[in-house]
Amino acid sequence: MIIGLTGSIGMGKSTLARMARRLGVAVHDADATVHALLGRRGAAVAAVLAAFPGVGTLTEGIDRKALGARVFGRPPALARLEAILHPLVRRREAAFLRCCGLGRRKVVILDVPLLFETGGEHRCDRVMVVSAPAFLQSQRVLRRPGMTAALLADIRARQTPEVVKRLNAEAVVPTGLGPRPALRALRANLTMARSGVRRWRRGKRTYRPHA
């Protein structure tokens, strides 16, 4: 079973992915893949430099801050970047799934921040959304270096609304009460997935921002 793990910025998705790994689940991290693609001698570096000259070098990779300044708030530029990165991420993801299939893993997780925004839910048997109250989300995100309220507002505007994610997912894992309740919820969902139990609430899967 392929579980798509997603959640808006600051909801605790990365923490939940780490928990899943500790429980023995194979996790493909889309964000980490992007970092590798843009890093030193990364597979996307040449194409990104061709599209956005001056944001890095072929040997040292891409300066993510410089790249962000060129694309955030500029939909055509962001679309150009995504057209470079998304196919490469999909290839890495497909290779991961092939390896998991060879290893006969019953459950794997695709950790994808923009799962719904890119149509990634169609590649998953189930979708698990990580959620927390908006005030807690803001507290977490604004503690990050370089983050501002304006930047957070821009990120939120580009992400699928929280209520829509919850409605379109089969499982919602709350992180607002701390790690222990989140871990319990994760364990319960993984147990159902591994046993083939079909008690997961079917998500509506009606949101189509990518259509």
Curated annotation (Swiss-Prot):
Summary of the function given for this chain in its UniProt record: Catalyzes the phosphorylation of the 3'-hydroxyl group of dephosphocoenzyme A to form coenzyme A.
SUPFAM superfamilies per record: P-loop containing nucleoside triphosphate hydrolases (SSF52540)
Enzyme class, spelled out: transferase
Species annotation: Rhodospirillum rubrum (strain ATCC 11170 / ATH 1.1.1 / DSM 467 / LMG 4362 / NCIMB 8255 / S1)
Pathway named in the protein's UniProt entry: Cofactor biosynthesis; coenzyme A biosynthesis; CoA from (R)-pantothenate: step 5/5
One of the record's GO cellular component terms: cytoplasm
EC numbers for this chain: 2.7.1.24
Binding site for ATP: 10-15
NCBIfam families: dephospho-CoA kinase
A GO MF label: dephospho-CoA kinase activity
Cellular location(s): Cytoplasm
Pfam families with a match to the protein in the record: CoaE
Entry keyword annotation includes Cytoplasm: yes
GO BP annotations listed: coenzyme A biosynthetic process
Catalysis performed (reactions): 3'-dephospho-CoA + ATP = ADP + CoA + H(+)
Chief place of localization: cytoplasm
Claim: Kinase is one of the keywords in the record: yes
Keywords from the UniProt entry: ATP-binding, Coenzyme A biosynthesis, Cytoplasm, Kinase, Nucleotide-binding, Transferase
Sequence ranges assigned to domain DPCK in this UniProt record: 2-204
Top-rank lineage group of the source organism: Bacteria
InterPro entries documented for this protein: Depp_CoAkinase, P-loop_NTPase
Alphabetized PANTHER family for the sequence: BIFUNCTIONAL COENZYME A SYNTHASE-RELATED, DEPHOSPHO-COA KINASE-RELATED
Family: Belongs to the CoaE family.
Protein name as it appears in the record: Dephospho-CoA kinase
